């Protein structure tokens, strides 16, 4: 399904019931890259609770001397979460609604979590590929992501795909 369109239905791992979702979910690793105090506050909030914070490499820490140890801890946390049964696997898309403040009041944005076929992805500035970024890719950030993924048991992508659908034919109320 969707192979020619660059996507397919994924196998998703979601936290089991009983996990504190307020501490489980964190922003993407490429946010707050110049604010170590933000990430320190998140760590304080999370504490010892299961959290995706333990599964990502916040880019604020890129270039730090402890990067190899941080990657080892991330991969160990992935293995531990799987061994402890903290995740439940599901097949299929997940429908997402997000309320944002906009001009004229709150607005609901709708979306689907899908698996993208990276064979259709090209991050070069001149790309006309089916899947391409809307902003420049920072090449120096690619190597640490590859290092984390090298021994990773899980994938934690943080891609938001925008589609041209002014008539609301793909996702509509």
Model-derived segments and spans:
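N-terminal extension/subdomain marker
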Residues: 1-172
């Amino acid at each position: 399904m969707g192979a020619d369109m660059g996507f397919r239905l994924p196998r998703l791992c979601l936290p089991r019931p009983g996990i504190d979702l307020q501490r489980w979910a964190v922003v993407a690793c490429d946010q707050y890259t110049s604010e170590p105090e933000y990430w320190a506050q998140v760590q304080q909030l999370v504490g010892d609770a299961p959290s995706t914070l333990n599964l990502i490499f916040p880019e604020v820490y890129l270039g730090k001397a402890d990067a190899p140890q941080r990657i080892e801890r991330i991969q160990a946390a992935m293995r531990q979460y799987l061994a402890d049964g903290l995740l439940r696997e599901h097949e299929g898309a997940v429908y997402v609604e997000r309320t944002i403040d906009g001009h004229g009041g709150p607005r609901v944005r709708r979306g689907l979590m899908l698996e993208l076929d990276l064979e259709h992805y090209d991050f070069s500035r001149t790309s006309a590929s089916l899947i391409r970024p809307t902003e420049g890719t920072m090449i120096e950030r690619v190597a640490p992501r590859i290092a984390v993924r090298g021994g990773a048991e899980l994938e934690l992508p943080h891609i938001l795909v925008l589609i041209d659908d002014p008539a609301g034919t793909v996702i509509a109320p």
